[in-house]
């Protein structure tokens, strides 16, 4: 999983991107190794769209937030911060899917926990899909990859600012739920 990096660290852009990609691959491997029934409830939060946005009319929505994806050193230790989140929801024929990866702050302050990767795969009302990947470092955009070969409505591509805003919102939801449930 991703090692904490102090703010202002002088890593090159290529090394930062490689670190993020490696961390994302590590998170995916850990999730594949654990089937949902076996995944410890204390290390995972599941929230439905009705709980997130009561009365909003969003259907079939679910957010999964995972803690402690790097259990190599202290398997019994529960991570205090979210590491990875994915959520889906549908509004009519429109489908939304997001993934977010964070790293832990060096100083243990949750306000300093930054997203490093944001992925979206959204399907518009014409059943056309667009994929978007943003890589961040210390809150700054490193790289953007957008695949819109199906020519989906561009409104379905979140901006980097929207991606960071969503990541912040989900981080707050995750940490509040973690506090309430412990």
Regions found by a protein language model. Name each.
Residues 35-98, 102-103:
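Surface-exposed acidic loop/strand-edge motifs in secreted or periplasmic proteins
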Residues 10-64, 123-182:
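Long terminal segments
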Residues 80, 89-133, 137-140:
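Mature extracellular/secreted ectodomains of secretory-pathway proteins
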Residues 1-12:
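Bacterial Sec-dependent N-terminal signal peptides
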């Amino acid at each position: 999983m991703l090692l904490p990096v102090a703010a202002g660290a002088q890593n090159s852009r290529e090394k930062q991107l490689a670190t993020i990609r490696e961390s994302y691959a590590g998170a995916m491997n850990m999730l594949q190794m654990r089937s949902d029934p076996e995944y410890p409830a204390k290390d995972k939060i599941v929230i439905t769209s009705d709980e997130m946005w009561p009365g909003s009319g969003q259907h079939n929505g679910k957010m999964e937030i995972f803690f402690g994806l790097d259990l190599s050193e202290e398997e019994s230790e529960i991570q205090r911060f979210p590491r990875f989140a994915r959520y889906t929801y549908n509004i009519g024929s429109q489908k939304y899917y997001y993934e977010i990866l964070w790293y832990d702050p060096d100083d243990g302050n949750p306000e300093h926990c930054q997203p490093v990767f944001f992925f979206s795969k959204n399907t518009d009302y014409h059943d056309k899909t667009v994929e978007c990947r943003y890589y961040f470092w210390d809150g700054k955009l490193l790289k953007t990859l957008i695949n819109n070969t199906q020519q989906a409505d561009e409104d379905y591509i979140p901006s980097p600012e929207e991606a960071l805003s969503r990541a912040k919102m989900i981080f707050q939801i995750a940490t509040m739920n973690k506090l309430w449930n412990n």
